[in-house]
């Protein structure tokens, strides 16, 4: 669905600004330092300074980069450090025309910010509105229209999920998981793992190593297990399109084949076997592995048609 690695449903490409990872979907979406316009734009940034968030469409902002905090939009509007499940708004604007009546968010120092129209004389705020608009987006976990599970023990973990189920686990390191329209499972135990899944099921497991896995799947199950064992190259790029492909460009080291090459044995001169052992009684095609004691410097030797 696109050109190159990490392109979703169009000509969008990933751009890295510092530790930020930016993915644009659904058409020719242009992004500049987190400015993503043209509907359905998903911007995943970690530790990146951004001028603006995502505008003009269903926007999802994920990580510690854009909009000065962890923000999540599940509707049309702009976010600036707050999370709203529904119609969102800019909590820092001074223009009442851009505000929505009865919109409630949580500000600093446990303050409630109530945005109303300037011509409204009275407002009724319910506790349900408060809880609906409460900022429950922590640790870079963002979910649009689906289930998203994000676990981060010791490191940075950014999980973005749109229209599907995304499971992201990061124990010790940096893990970036972006999932659009499908199921994505990303686990990173010790190292850096980058998992990208567009329109399909992707399973990425990275244990003990710096492994970059870029997986663009079209209705294909790809199982990519990368570590520091049985691999020649620590970087694996797995791209599947409408087929069953497992461990693309991954070279497994086969079990070694043991080949024993015996050292050459010099034949002794003047060795005579005992009289009770007559080699002439055996056929020529029989292998002689019987011991015989020869007069070869008083040593016991093996007999194979000749004394050695």
Curated annotation (Swiss-Prot):
Residues 47-99 have a biased composition (Low complexity). The keyword Secreted applies. InterPro entries: Kazal_dom_sf. Keywords: Secreted. Component of the acid-insoluble organic matrix of the calcified shell. It is found in: Secreted. The keyword NADP does not apply. It comes from Ruditapes philippinarum (Japanese carpet shell). Residues 1-21, 47-104, 134-250 are annotated as: Disordered. This is Insoluble matrix shell protein 4. Gene3D superfamilies: 3.30.60.30. The lineage of its organism: Eukaryota, Metazoa, Spiralia, Lophotrochozoa, Mollusca. One of its GO terms (cellular component) is extracellular region.
